[in-house]
Structures are given as structure tokens and as C-alpha cells.
Amino acid sequence: MIKNELNQKLQLTCIVCALLSGTNYLHANGKWSDRHEKGIIPTVKKLTEEGIHINGTVRDSQGEPLSGVNIVIKGQTIGTTTDIDGNYFLEVPSRSSVLVFTYIGFEEQEIVVGNQININLNMHEISTGLNEVVVVGYGSQKRASIVGSITTIEPQVLSQGTTRALSNNLAGNVAGVIAVQRSGEPGADGSNFWIRGISSFQGAGTSPLVLVDGIERTLDDLNPAEIESFSVLKDASASAVYGVRGANGVILVQTKRGKLGKPTVNVHFEQSFTQPTKLPQYIGSAEYLTLLNEIAKDNGQQQSPYSQETIDHYINRTDPDLYPDVNWMDLITKDFAMNQRADITVNGGSDILRYAVVGSYYGEQGIFERDKSQSWNSGTHLNKFNLRSNVDINITKTTQLTVSVGGYLQEMNKMAISSDDAFSGAFETPPFIHPAYYKEDDNIYFPVVNQRVNPYVQVTQKGYATTSQSKIESLFALEQDLKFITPGLKIKGIFSFDRYSWSGVTRSKTPDLYQPATQRDENGNLILNISSYGQQFLSTSENNDWGNKATYVELNLNYERTFGKHQVEGLFLYNQRDYQQFEESYDIVPYRRMGIAGRASYTYDNRYIAEFNFGYNGSENFAKGYRFGFFPSVAIGYLLSEEKFMEPYKDTFSKIKFRGSFGLTGNDQLDGRRFAYQTTLGEDGTGYDWGTNGQYYHRNSRFEGDFGIPNLTWETVSKTNAGFELGLWNMIDFQVDYFFEHRYNIFMKRNNIPTSAGFRNTPWANYGKVNNQGIDLALNVNKQINKDLYVGFRGSFTYAQNKIIEQDEALGVMGTNRQRTGEKVNQLFGLVDEGLFTFDDFQKDANGDYLIAENGGYVVNKDIPTHTFGPVRPGDIKYKDVNGDGVVSSLDETAIGGTYNPQIVYGFGTNFRYKNLDFNIFFQGNGMTYGFKGGCSNKFTPGETMGAMGNILTNYQDRWTVENPSQDVYYPRLTWGKARIMSETLHGGWKT
């Protein structure tokens, strides 16, 4: 399958950082004052003449000056930053003032002014990140106390990609995440991604839960500039608190919040371009017709379909209208398309109010061509605007109000047909049947062949479609410190309301279409005959509207306190969510969930850690008595590096940590089926006519639809995880995890119930079981060589393999080679090839001539199984009789290869920073992924319509022929018609 647009991109990035603030200057008279440039917001308060003037230099542990260090007077809004040489000047109100020094990647430090006037400081890098705060389920923890399998990634890494969809930046960047981008089409280019692979049957929910600021939202709605932290929860101890939503893992995203200090403004702009990484290369008309002659001869035709004179016309391009040679892929696509991204971030605040505002724009064009002579535009272009504002207000010293509002507006224009149809037309249309259009007397005429399309017409003449999307997200939270009851106790309430709307309009038309011209008249004009009349105007608009809204409520109680060497943490919360879809005036029954969750964690002497989590959740998707479930987890951890006997080796082993967990999580996404415990009724038009005397009334018939199963419940996953973390020399961080998951009660339709049971639709059941296991690892290296040079490396590797332990299969399949139990989820099935037929595989008569079968093929030897898919000849694929019945048929299909989804995903890259110049390079890839070259609908093999089914790849010469009867070729014998089936049946091993 060819992707519509692939994301090979070159990126030109311009980052402008401006610290907009009041700056203190020393006048000639010795007086200090504030000077503000025009348009710059003053934020440093004017001080009285009695203020104390402080200056100094801030350096790192190696004595190199640090530029951009934030220095704020504790409890006030007065502050400044160091210049490029690490120097600063600041006026403080009194000698009791406390200066707070903060800098990313360094430990925060506080210094009392006292009698000092010159305060110099050496800041120290944060060691191994043990004190770093990591976002976890319904809260945050220090990295040292985390015993679950959690991967975090810096927001800067996510912003290095140049596509609209944030999900495209996960593969290879985040250990444990397997992601596949199926399309590059603007607006539809997001990746499918899974945490630690797939462990449920296709159709059931396999996507992870994505929470933005604690609210269930869509990852690709975000702009990377909005993100402050990004965490992936992989094991049960990390995700059990989410109960029936945690089986597939959880992604937690926190958006940027305001920081104490003067406002900073960051402006970012980038220009990039998109081009297809690889498009199929096809042969031209002359080669095509020559090959068709060869195939005809091989099939016993005495006369070639195309004369050499005709082929010479194509070679010499004597008359391109009558003898065209069209590269349809080049005709309908551009070489590249431009993209732009721009964002602006404003961040700052005081002890009372802190704010972060992020606005962004993203524009992207598609690679399909348009007809610029049209008054309307069928070209693909997307414009997206994001805005997010997060405000934190300290109402009192113990009460904080949070108000967060965000959203986006996206407008898109594209051709009226789908991109899949556009590519399909280019794949299927040979280069010689007609040109894109005829131009006669300044008029344009579009040719087409029956049962085919004109790819150029499809892309440029069929009209256009526009879509508009908008979303508003809101969150309100109130947190109260309850230290008057006991220190470390807090209560927090959260309310969120989101609303999404989508609307689309399609304006379509069809031009007049003509039969391909075959000759010219005596005046040299093309003789054109109409094939079908179209319309010269765009059709009436077709409107579609869709949307949804979601409400979320949460109340949580948090406790965190340290008693000597003992550190305890606790969480208890209640939440509920209401989600409703609506289409035009039709409202769908809301989806509702509610539950409670809790966490208890104990750490002794920063070395030994134990944690218990649980979720008790309910879903309206099940019958009463089956709606709620309890999902517990336990985890332990041991920090060897914190032992006293390790202190002499601290410079080398900055972190050595062992951890393990076990627990249960659930999944209530049941293959799109709602209220499966209820029996449904269906209706059709095959009912009865009622009445007398010629007056009859028709009544539709009703029938039993899906049979209700009252004891259906959620899928349950037991997860086991063992992890090891190693830090070396305060610059290398290595993490590896082994995981094993057993998923049971998988929701599926029964397949072995006979039709005599009377079910119109087979009933559902919690029947399936799947095991999933693997490893994921991550390596990060960060080294500040000196004040000007920084070097970094990052890499990740994920391997996940699943196996179906139990699955309800049809009686005729169970116990045979077609059984899917024991195979991978979404395992590919097909015939097993045993090479190509040779001349020795067929019977001859007494005269030495090959025996001809009734279907036109040759008669195979008696020791070779009968092939039922069509006539066979030397050069065709020989298939294995897997079930041993002497016949090759669909009953011989068995597991071949693997799955379309990769089992291995990896990535690695390096980055250098010298002064203000950054250089980044990153590679990502996947392995153990399989697919068929073409299958039964192969578009690259000659066929029967107009002498051909589709285009032919340029590597066609690597094929079996009588002159080259090799087994080591890319293609088997090329043919057409019914015989073509034998060379296209799904199979494994033959050049896959």
C-alpha cells in the first residue's frame, strides 16, 4: 500500500526568545531606576531610595557563567535574569530578603541577603533526576519514589517533528510505545499507537487512554508548544487507578503553567516541506505493449495484439493524443508541498497569580495537483489555530484556584474524492489508453474508458470538499491546603467541560467525458465521440454535522508527609464522566462512567519503597450487578545506590534501582457494541400486507437482532513488570523493563454455535484470552562539556509479542491449519509456496507434447496436488497441500509471516548545542512487520481490461520467462485473464 503522503521532511527552524522585562540601569548620579522599552510590559516594581543594591555572578559547578538564570526575591514579584556573562544586578527592599535562584536542569537555591552586597553563586546540576517530579496517575511523585513502569519524554523532543499530529513523534522516541503512521494526508496523518503492543482482538479497544491535564482528550489536538510534561504509564501499578480504562496503558500530558517571575515571551517559527519518500515507478507505453505481446504469445496466441508499427508510434511520440505515454503518478502529484508552524508563549506571574498563554498556527498543503483554471480550488490545504490559557490564582495562602481554557479551530479544503481513490486510479490506469485530456480549438475534452476512471479528472475536475472543526476545552479546579488538620493534607475539586464540533460541505461535479480518440479527420482534427454527459456547475452543497461534549467531575484527597526516615503518601478520589455524541438533531445515549481510586505509598530512608494502588470503577455498558470492578496493584522498589556502602561510588553509580509490580486493569471498550446485555429487535421491508377489499397496508417484519447476554463484563488484564534503572556519572541514564500480560474475558462473537440454534446474529461472550510479553529499554546521555558545548544521545527499543490462548472459532476450523488460536493477534493467513512450477512438473503425451487441462492449463504430475485456483503452467507459483487432501484450495491457508503491525520499534539520535546553534538528528524504524505484495487485487500485474489490469512496476524484467526459467526471480510468470489468479493468490514466502 502506498501512503498518501509520507513524512520525510526538511526543517528550517528559527527560534526567537525574548525576555521582556524592566531592566535596572545605574545613572551617572549613582541613582538606580527602571527603564522600559516602548511596548515592553514593566514587571519589576519601582523601589524606594532606601533599597539595597545587589550584584554578582552565577556560574555552574565548573565555574562557567550561566546565562538566563532567574533570580527572584522570595514572596515578591521583584526579579531579574543573568546576562550572557552570568552577571546580574538587583535592588532588594531589605537585608532580610531571600534571593531564589532557578535554572532548568539545576538545583534551586536560596540565599539570605544579610550584609552582603556582592553575591556570587555556583549552581549544581540536578543529580540523576531523583528529585525530579514526575506526573503519575491522579498526581505526581518524585522520580526516586516511583516503582511503576513510567516513561517520560522532554517536550522539546516532541516538538522536533514537523507534522500536525503529535502521535507521529512517538515511535522510537518513547520506550514501550509502538506506533505506525498509515497515511501522510493532511488532517488524516495521525499514527495508530499502542503501549506495549496489542493484546486484544481486532475491533475491541486497543488504544491507550490519553489524559490532558487529567481530562480524557485527544493527543493530536495538542500543539507541542503547549506541553510541559509527557508521561507514559505502562504497568499495572501505574495504571490500576484508572480501572476499566487502564488495560491499554495511559498517556498523561500536562500543559504549561505559569512560573513565578517576570513575563517571558518565546516566539517560534519553522518552515518545512513535505515530499513523498518513495512512489512506485512504472514502465512506459512502449515497454507495456511489448510485454503484452510477450504474454499473449506465452498464452498461445498466434498474432501479437500490438504491431511493431504501433509500438514505434509510442516510442517516437508521433502523436501524443493518439499514442499517449502518461505517467499518471507524476501528473496528479506535486514534487513537494510547503508547511508552516508558528507559536508564541507568554509565561510569568507572582505569588498571587501565575499565567501561561500559548497561541499557535499550523498550515500544511497536500501533494495533489489542482486545475488552476477552475474558479474553485480542489487542492489540499489545512489551517489550524490553537490557543491555551492556564491561570493559577492563590486566593489565600492555603487556597488555589486554577482556570484553564484551550481549544483549536481547523479549516481544511481538499478534492471531492478520497486520496485512496485518487491513488487507486493512478495505479490502475495504464499509460497508453488515453492522455489526461485533449485540447482542440482552445477547448478541453476529457477521455475515459468504460469501467475505468481518468485519474486527472478524478483529482482536478470532480469538485472540492471543505471541513471545519472546532473544540473548546475548559477546566476549573479549587485546591485547599488542610494543614490546619494535619500537615501534608490537601483536598481538590475539579470540573471540566469540553465540546467538539465538525461540519463538512462537499461540492461535486462531473465534466462531459469522451471516448478515447483513435483517429483524426481529413483536417487533422481529432474525431471525438461523447461517452457521457456531465454537468457544468457544482452540485448543491452536501452538509454533514457531527460533534460531542464531555463533562468530568473529580474530588480527591492527597496526603504527603515525612517522619524522619519514613515518607508516606496517600490518595483517595471520586470521579465521574459523561460523554455524549450528537449528529445534527439526533442525540445518542450518553456514555457514563464513575468510580473511586486510591494509592498508598511508603518509602523508608529513600531506599525501600512499597506502593498499593486500586481502582473501583463502573461503566453503564453492562447490566446491573456487573457494572463495577475492583482493580488492585502492588509494587516494590529498592534503590541500591542510596545505601551507605555505595557512597564512595556515588560519582560513578549515580543511580541503581530495582523495581517490580503486579496488578489488574480493565477494558470496557467492547468492539463498538453498546448495552450488549440487552436483546435488540430489527426491522426490514419483507413483512406482510394486511387488509381487505383491495385496501392493503404493508407492515414491516420484525426479528430478533443481537441476543442479550446479561452476565457480560469487562476485559481484565493481569500485568507483571520487572524493571532496572542505572545512572552513571550523572550523565548516563539507562532503563530496561520486562513485562508479561495475560488478558482474559475478551469480548467477542461466538463462532461455533450452529445455525440450528436459531440465532439470527450469533451472540457475544467474554471468551477470548491473549498473552503478551516483551521488553522495552531506553538510554539517555546528557553532557555539558563546557559553557558553550552540550552533547546528548537518546535511544529506545521496544519488543512486544502476543499469542492467542483461547478464541472461539468455527467447528470446521478448530484443530486445523486454519485455526487462529495459538497464533498472533491479526496474524496473516495464506497459502505456503514451494517455489515455481517447472517444465518437469507437467505430464506429456506420447508425442512429447504437454497435456492440456480443461481450464486451459497443463496437467500436473500425479504426485503434485491439484491446484483449484485456475490453470497452471511452468513459471506459476506452486502451493503446498498443507492439509494433505491432495488438493490445493482455501482449506490449505495457514499462518504465514506475522502481522501488519510491527513487533519491534526502535529509535536513536544525537544532538549537539554550541552556543546558540543546535543540531539534531534522529533515526527511527520498526521490524518484524509483514504484508502481501499485492494479493487478489494486485494492481501491478497485467490483466484483461483493455489488455491490462493496471500499471507495471519497472522491475518487471526480474521475472520468470521461458528464456529465464529461474526460481530466484521477483515475479512469477506474467499472464492475464483467469490464469492470472494463480499468480496472485495470497501466499507467503515468495519474495514477500
Language model features with spans:
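Short, small/polar-rich motifs associated with maturation and membrane association
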Residues: M1-L387, L401, G812, R873, ...
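Short solvent-exposed strand-capping/beta-turn motif centered on an Asx-Ser/Thr pair
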Residues: S61-G63, D481, G727, Q784
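Short linear motifs in exposed loops
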Residues: Q62, V69, V92, D220, ...
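Beta-strand-rich extracellular modules
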Residues: T102-F106, E479, N782
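Outer/extracellular conduits and scaffolds centered on Gram-negative outer-membrane beta-barrels
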Residues: T152, Q160-T163, W194, I198, ...
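Acidic/polar loop-and-plug regions of large Gram-negative outer-membrane beta-barrel proteins
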Residues: Q301-P324, T398, Y408, N413-E473, ...
